[in-house]
């Protein structure tokens, strides 16, 4: 969607001109899964599937929201003085949360807004539509109210909204990737220290194909919180002998020597995934920097196997996509991405083989699962921004 279309749609809905237009990307994580809430390393990119916005300031204290993705809900009106979570306010709880925490941080938002939203991230796909919306709202508020914010502070407010307003116990990776994204770069982030490096992403003759299971993944209702609790329990058991706060601090030799402290076989498997995935993510960064895409692909495959057997967050749909992808010509690697339990997988595919790949994987998936997957090419882009 371009800026003139955004402005046109805004005027159709609100009857006045927008002040500015905005874009906030989605994200995929190339490798480093379920490590972000375990103090580990991640390697995400911001992508051109994302959330568009148009907005204007109002003279009163009313917030009016409209989403083209939820047209049937019409314009949702919220008083600026009442930024509490209310179930009937549906998707607008995300912007309300961001505004609430911006105010709590001492920023003055002294009048209402009209905000038009259009997103082309498929709902429930696990490509971070909620984080994309959170960062979009932050950028809108920065621009309309002339607020000077460090981007990292905005990223943290997005996470705070997710955790403390919506009630989802997620890590910081999604908001970080979306807020800090850079053209043609992956972000190597240490979630323990929030130190990060931009890693140039030269895929040569290959593209990242996103494969959507089209099985919705409701993060708050999934086993995500259960996995997180298992990891936290494993840490507390290891603390009997080890001075650690997170699994991300462990190398595999140390973990292997002390894993006997963990009293449950499942918790050992969960912790083993995190420790090894952390090492794979560092190796993947080195492979990218060395231009070793074959090595990078092998690490993607190993990541999926670990998520399937040790972390147990894949399921029939994601496994069918990844396993079928591994068998195709021109594929360097494939894995699930995101929280799992549905959502998306990704594959690194030679660009001349993409059509054959989509046909073969799509056909096999439909045979096994009973309905078709969707495919998108992931184009890497910069972080949340003002368009005009």
From Swiss-Prot:
The yes or no answer to whether the keyword DNA-binding is present is: no
UniProt-annotated binding residues for Mg(2+): 130, 162
Q: From what superkingdom does this record's organism come?
A: Bacteria
Q: Which InterPro entries match?
A: Galactokinase (IPR000705), Galactokinase_bac (IPR022963), Galactokinase_CS (IPR019741), GalKase_N (IPR019539), GHMP_kinase_C_dom (IPR013750), GHMP_kinase_C_sf (IPR036554), GHMP_kinase_N_dom (IPR006204), GHMP_knse_ATP-bd_CS (IPR006203)
Of the GO CC terms on this record, one is: cytosol
The biological pathway it contributes to is: Carbohydrate metabolism; galactose metabolism
Question: Per UniProt, where does ATP bind?
Answer: 67, 124-130
Write one Gene Ontology MF term.
galactokinase activity
Q: Which reaction does it catalyse?
A: alpha-D-galactose + ATP = alpha-D-galactose 1-phosphate + ADP + H(+)
Q: Top enzyme class of this protein?
A: transferase
Q: Which UniProt keywords apply?
A: ATP-binding, Carbohydrate metabolism, Cytoplasm, Galactose metabolism, Kinase, Magnesium, Metal-binding, Nucleotide-binding, Transferase
The residues that hold substrate are: 33-36, 224
The principal localisation class reads cytoplasm
GO BP, sorted A to Z: galactose metabolic process
Which EC numbers does the record give? 2.7.1.6
The site annotation (Transition state stabilizer) covers 27
Cell compartments where the protein resides: Cytoplasm
Q: Where is the active site?
A: 174
Which positions, given as ranges, span the membrane? Answer: none
Checking NCBIfam families in the record gives: gal_kin, PRK05322.1
The cross-references to HAMAP family, in alphabetical order and at most eight, read: Galactokinase
Q: Provide the function of this protein.
A: Catalyzes the transfer of the gamma-phosphate of ATP to D-galactose to form alpha-D-galactose-1-phosphate (Gal-1-P).
Hey, which family's this protein in? Belongs to the GHMP kinase family. GalK subfamily.
**Protein name, per record:** Galactokinase
- What organism does the UniProt record list as the source? Streptococcus thermophilus (strain CNRZ 1066)
This protein's gene is called galK
